[in-house]
Swiss-Prot record:
GO BP terms in the entry: DNA transposition
Name by which UniProt lists this protein: Transposase for insertion sequence element IS231A
GO molecular function annotation: DNA binding; transposase activity
UniProt keyword DNA-binding present: yes
Amino acid sequence: MNLSIQDELQLFSEELCRHLTPSFLEELAKKLGFVKRKRKFSGSELATICIWISQRTASDSLVRLCSQLHAATGTLMSPEGLNKRFDKKAVEFLKYIFSILWKGKLCKTSAISSTALTHFQRIRILDATIFQIPKHLASIYPGSGGCAQTAGIKIQLEYDLHSGQFLNFQVGPGKNNDKTFGTECLDTLRPGDLCIRDLGYFSLEDLDQMDQRGAYYISRLKLNHTVYIKNPSPEYFRNGTVKKQSQYIQVDLEHIMNHLKPGQTYEIKEAYIGKNQKLFTRVIIYRLTEKQIQERRKKQAYTESKKGITFSEKSKRLTGINIYVSNTPEGIVPMEQIHDFYSLRWQIEIIFKTWKSLFQIHHWQNIKQERLECHVYGRLIAIFICSSTMFKIRKLLLQKNKRELSEYKAIGMIQDHVSLLYQAIQRNTQDLTKILIRLFDLLQKNGRKSHRYEKKTIFDIMGVVYEYNGFGKQKKAA
């Protein structure tokens, strides 16, 4: 059944309101023990200040926060009284709201149609963002150590590129290991999923598990892993058995690199990775352009000077190539498209950019742990509300107008309307739907993604059919 734009947004409004209405928040606050008796500052007021009206719960003065709360709700609090309400129960309350939102159904109907979706159930993107926090919290949130980071929070996210649905999420210390979380994410794998992983999450065991569970992967290969091919002429013992050390031949990656032109791709179709536990996989080597090489060298120099990490001579020699491993069928993702598909991973960088530049999740003063955590979870809830709204409208714009929405532009515009969303939720779903229709009209007019010359967008790579204005109106599909 094809629903109208208004009907779709009405259903979205009802799902969003389920966990954000004042009555729900009051009941939840009692259930979790944040409120034990009737008082002027309850669950609804905490949500108001941390989610809706303040982006700077961790950096604005308590006097300013009290003023903002009074302006929005009429609740009169002293700075000392407000500070006391930022306690462990408050953190638990906000954490619970965030959990039921991202594990809920908000994004389940936001998947866009694409050629990729006919082959892959979900395109799973995994990455992490990290930011420094007050040094006195180093025992609770030890930092990663880079840039003298003694205390830090790392947020790890895996989401589906088709729908925007959060699949796995973790807030923890900056020193948390990426690879460990990557392994935990395997629990939510489904057959037909495509997992795109960067070097921080590289694990031969994880890639093998994906393959065994009927999922697909595209991953960068760590350069300390050796690539082998089967020896066509192995040595034999007199009894006819193959000598183990002659069974495989090591591939000279540097030799291949030197024979590739910038932008050229080369594939080893039946390769083995690892000295002991060998992973049978496709290996795709992409020769970087001169501009890409210069950017990588600049990044390596920065990493060595700021983080104290020294790159091996082998890594420096192989700066000119990206090495990918994948178990995707060649007929679905030919070698020429592997680099483009891997570049879909950079979409999560856009999401993290909005967290800091628009939602200021990393801004804080020298405050207590509970207030900082209330700020983090309040921002995450606001982020999820805005991003879910963006993914829903992205789908509707594609359905109605065949247009590609700019995620960054759209989230910024939706954030500008957060106060209106808040006011509507206090009333009813019909009023919220009206605000969402206004947002749809705004994003339809001003939210279109800009196209750089000869640069593919996410829709191009995924094979989404859409219209754009280049030299005249055309339809594009990868």
